[in-house]
Curated annotation (Swiss-Prot):
Keyword tRNA processing set for record: yes
InterPro entries recorded: ArchSynthase1/Queuine_TRR, TGT, TGT-like_sf, tRNA_ribo_trans-like
Gene: tgt
Disulfide bonds: none
Record's keyword terms, sorted: Glycosyltransferase, Metal-binding, Queuosine biosynthesis, Transferase, tRNA processing, Zinc
Domain of life, source organism: Bacteria
Protein name (record): Queuine tRNA-ribosyltransferase
Source species of the chain: Bacillus subtilis (strain 168)
Known catalytic reactions: 7-aminomethyl-7-carbaguanine + guanosine(34) in tRNA = 7-aminomethyl-7-carbaguanosine(34) in tRNA + guanine
């Protein structure tokens, strides 16, 4: 195989927690890890421009294979010169495989060895997605990091079902590698499945490591399981993965889960949470989250977070943002989205600094105490 387009550089381990500080090198630049990746489902991070994402120091964003396959279609993106040119983003892009959307959005699906028959969630048309098709679409999109097409089992799932699912995901992963025809330009990550069963996670990791992917994702978490289950699964799964490859926990983006994931050896995270809740008027602050629709902000002329130096907090007040959100003004959604993404990207910078200083455990305690996670009945984000 030619030299891998995706390379992980280990920098240091936190003596207090074992968390990793590293750097991922891609054809479109490098980024330090642990990293949070904003989600740009349809080749746009909702309400944000690429320039704004760069201003908050996003080194990599995620786009969605399933959605781009349906609209505008991978051929149009390819004709534009690939996803980077299409959306005017010259930093790294990761595309998911479409597997999660097939299993979560489509009410009518039939899984067989060849792939999955399902219905388009927009118009009900019959569609078929296979490992080969997922690779064809992602090769056309031209992302830096592609994901293997996996089966996404429901939570909770019976052991026997999960065992069959893991075996199929391993077979599909091999088919993805064989179908991936731009291996010198795009890195393909395998996805470890197995639910909360340690022996199945072990088998899944073993199968995928034998195929020598340039990176590995941990799938099947953040699907409704309690936080302690997720942490337990990470504790026995991340040590199975190679130390010289990046580890990506899919679909995780609440502040507590980002910190706890980093402590358990995860390098990369993505989630729609910060952008989705922003559009409902909910924002992160160092002292917990706020709902900007709340009447108590009507005459509150402070910034969302007095410690935050983002564009929103430097220029606008809670009262103004509440007014915009209540009037359904697009600018309000832009301001809350900007702040939430900046908050999580800055949080990951704090996590990386704490690893450098061997004090991530202390940082976790300080952050959880201020944010309110230690209170009884604390919300998850």
């Amino acid at each position: 195989m030619a030299e891998q387009p995706i390379r992980y550089e280990f920098i240091k381990e936190c003596k207090q927690t074992g968390a990793r500080l590293g750097k991922v090198h891609t054809p479109h630049g490098s980024f330090e890890t642990p990293v949070f990746m904003p989600v740009g489902t349809l080749a746009t991070v909702k309400t944000m421009s690429p320039e704004e994402l760069k201003a908050m120091d996003a080194g990599i964003i995620l786009s969605n294979t399933y959605h781009l396959w349906l609209r505008p279609g991978q051929d149009i993106v390819k004709e534009a010169g690939g996803l980077h040119k299409f959306m005017n983003w010259d930093r790294a892009i990761l595309t998911d495989s479409g597997g999660f959307q097939v299993f979560s959005l489509s009410k009518f699906r039939n899984i067989e060895e060849e792939g999955v028959h399902f219905r388009n969630h927009l118009n009900g048309d019959k569609l078929f997605l296979s490992p080969e098709k997922a690779m064809e679409i992602q090769n056309a999109l031209g992302s830096d990091i592609m994901m293997a097409f996996d089966e996404c089992p429901p939570y909770p799932a019976e052991y026997d079902y999960m065992k069959r699912s893991v075996e199929r995901t391993s077979r599909w992963a091999e088919r993805c590698l064989n179908a991936h025809n731009r291996q010198d330009e795009q890195g393909l990550f395998g996805i470890v499945q197995g639910g909360e069963y340690e022996d199945l996670r072990t088998q899944s990791a073993k199968d995928l490591i034998s195929l020598d992917f340039p990176g590995y994702a941990i799938g099947g978490l953040s699907v409704g399981e309690p936080k302690d289950v997720m942490n337990r699964v990470l504790e026995f799964t991340t040590p199975l993965l190679p130390k010289d490859k990046p580890r990506y926990l899919m679909g995780v983006g609440s502040p507590d889960a980002l910190i706890d994931g980093a402590i358990r050896g995860v390098d990369m995270f993505d989630c729609v949470l910060p952008t989705r809740i922003a559009r409902n008027g909910t924002v992160f602050t160092a002292e917990g989250r706020l709902n900007m629709k709340n009447a108590k902000f009507e005459r509150d002329f402070r910034p969302i977070d007095e410690e935050c130096d983002c564009y929103t907090c430097k220029n606008y007040t809670r009262a103004y943002i509440r007014h915009l959100i209540r009037c359904n003004e697009t600018f309000g959604l832009r301001l809350t989205t900007y702040h939430n993404l900046h908050f999580l990207l800055h949080l990951m910078e704090q996590v990386r600094q704490a690893i450098r200083e061997d004090r991530l455990g202390d940082f976790r305690e300080e952050f959880f105490e201020r944010y309110g996670y230690n209170k009884p009945n604390a919300k998850s984000f």
